[in-house]
Amino acid sequence: MIARDRNWLLIFAVCAALAVIYPFFADGYQLTVIRDALIFGLFAASLDFFWGRTGILCFGHAAFFGIGGYIMALITLDDAIPFGSLLGILGAVAGAAFVAAIIGYFLFFGGIRGSYFTIVTLAMGVICQQAAVSWSSVTGGDSGLIGIPPIEFDLGGMHVDLSQDLPSYIFVAAIVAMVVLALWSISRGRWGTVLTAIQDNEVRAAALGHNAPLRLLVTFVLSAAIAGLAGALYVCMAGLVAPDLSGLLLSTEVIVWVAVGGRGTLLGPVLGAIFIQRAQQTISSFNPSLWPLLLGCVFVVIVFVLPDGILSIYARLKALFKGRRRAQ
């Protein structure tokens, strides 16, 4: 195992340990704040899995988050379907993946890459948000849909109700940990190696026998499916869904979370989302108008001081201490 993998697993283990002990020191409100931040972290990790491994930026990624949220809401809103929560989650994942498969097929097999891909996905996000506003008979229009029930299911004869703060926090934290670890395993395996080769030189990768458009499509679909899962979890915890969840603002914010946390690290975007969401909650409680300015300053500082994101701090400190030891 190379040093980079050991560092990642060590940071992951520390974060998991902190997530386990956090409920012992937090009240209900703090648990809900971190729970929601973890969901956004899962959303950020889904974008990073595609953007970080392929180098192609999807600027409308919130569309998949919103699609997942609306599908979850429509399936569970009346609370009349048996196993509604499970069907809602499966429907959200499948719906987001289906839309990504259709769009991605024409883009990747049509040779659309780089800034052109970014522009097309930006338009996709705008279209999805406008559809959510205009299709008011289904989506509720500008007001969205409210009264979405929390996730409920039976596990080994025990009924689990995620309307409470602690169970919902544990459930979300477990989902995020498992998904991030699974994505990291994929990224560090042969699939991730081929994606890196495609990112470096797609023509050369194709000459070696790799079907680059298909690889990119599958990665894009998996990324969208996880974004749909995050959207489904969010609307169940929040109890509502609105067009803003598929809008340009959220698509921009998730890019910032990934950049702040560290693109290509998967765990970094989760930490970036938690850091920014927590900072926003704290600062906005004192002066809401101050937050956009501070966010811009934080982003500029990260770009110049920590271009690899906050997750690179550990590696930098480790290298610094090693350098001092050698100097002595």
For each of these PLM feature ranges, what is it?
Residues 1-328:
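Transmembrane alpha-helices and adjacent helix-loop boundaries
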